[in-house]
Curated annotation (Swiss-Prot):
GO terms for molecular function: 16S rRNA (adenine(1518)-N(6)/adenine(1519)-N(6))-dimethyltransferase activity; RNA binding. This is Ribosomal RNA small subunit methyltransferase A. GO terms for cellular component: cytosol. PANTHER family: DIMETHYLADENOSINE TRANSFERASE (PTHR11727), DIMETHYLADENOSINE TRANSFERASE-RELATED (PTHR11727:SF7). The gene is rsmA. It holds the Pfam family RrnaAD. Keywords: Cytoplasm, Methyltransferase, RNA-binding, rRNA processing, S-adenosyl-L-methionine, Transferase. SUPFAM superfamilies: S-adenosyl-L-methionine-dependent methyltransferases (SSF53335). Specifically dimethylates two adjacent adenosines (A1518 and A1519) in the loop of a conserved hairpin near the 3'-end of 16S rRNA in the 30S particle. May play a critical role in biogenesis of 30S subunits. S-adenosyl-L-methionine binds at residues 21, 23, 48, 69, 92, 113. Belongs to the class I-like SAM-binding methyltransferase superfamily. rRNA adenine N(6)-methyltransferase family. RsmA subfamily. Signal peptide: none annotated. It is found in: Cytoplasm. It is an enzyme of class 2 (transferase).
Length: 281
């Protein structure tokens, strides 16, 4: 039977302002849950449960499930449907303190079909809690996942690649076509697995994320130009030759570790405030 594409699912009209596209493909749902492999002792958190496509099979694996949902209509619906077994945090995931859900001795795991219109800022927000999280599994626009896992030298390698790869090991788990959703998005989707690097096993030196954000924002500000042009303003405060950093390269050719080295050499007064804009590369 053909799936509905009207945007109305289980009596709920998908809201464009919340970026709602409801997952309706049972095969994809089961594949995602299998990839997550929830364990009874996990502290499992779902962002944007929507109408419960992932929520139901996840709740079959854990005693309680915590969810973060912005849509008030869906919050009420979820509470009526699942009762005390579901702990609902009503509010914006972009402002939620995920660190408060960490329980010593238990694995904090975060999953979700993320709204594509806020995916990059939400990923950056979540990175602040990486030291308390075991792993994350997210459905995202495939183009975003491609950027997240891209290697230096590829066209997809970007600011987002650098800022997330320094915090996580990441891999593409599953590709998902538009027809798996109601309403179908205009783009292909994919599931990504994100595992925070343990402090003692990270391939990268510790780095101030604001300093790294400052460097990569400058570096990728004009992708077609070599770094001698985009990072030229830093030559007065950083000895690039001493770092062995070749300014004749383009930003997309530079390994993450090289960006980290530059960020660690950046004087505090040159660090830009706030989080970098990761939406455009």
């Amino acid at each position: 039977m053909a799936r509905s594409t009207s945007g109305v699912h289980q009596g709920h009209q998908a809201r464009k302002r919340f970026g709602q596209n409801f997952l309706v493909d049972d095969g994809v749902i089961h594949a995602i849950v299998a990839a997550i492999d929830p364990q009874p002792d996990d502290v499992l958190v779902e962002i944007g449960p929507g109408l419960g496509a992932l929520t139901v099979p996840l709740m079959e694996r854990v005693p309680t499930l915590q969810v973060v949902e912005l849509d008030r209509d869906l919050v009420a619906r979820l509470q009526r449907r699942f009762g005390d077994k579901l702990i609902v945090h009503a509010g914006d995931a972009l402002a939620f303190d995920f660190g408060t859900l960490h329980v010593p001795g238990r694995s904090l795991r975060i999953v979700g079909n993320l709204p594509y219109n806020i995916s990059s800022p939400l990923l950056f927000h979540l990175s602040a809690f990486a030291d308390r999280v075991r792993d994350q599994h997210f459905m995202l626009q495939k183009e975003v996942v491609d950027r997240m896992v891209a290697a230096p030298g590829s066209k997809a390698f970007s600011r987002l690649s650098v800022m997330l790869q320094v915090r996580y090991y990441m891999e593409l788990v599953l590709e998902v076509p538009p027809g798996s959703f109601n309403p179908p998005p205009k783009v292909d989707s994919a599931v990504v697995r994100m595992i925070p690097w343990p402090a003692d096993k990270s391939p990268y030196a510790p780095v101030d994320m604001r300093a790294l954000g400052t460097v990569v924002t400058l570096a990728f500000s004009q992708r077609r130009k070599v770094l001698r042009n985009t990072l030229g303003s830093l030559r007065e405060v950083i000895d690039f030759d001493a770092l062995g950093f070749d300014l004749g390269r383009r930003a997309e050719e530079v390994p993450v570790a090289d960006f980290v080295a530059v960020a660690n050499a950046l004087p505090a007064e040159r660090i830009a405030g706030g989080a970098p804009d990761l939406n455009e590369d």
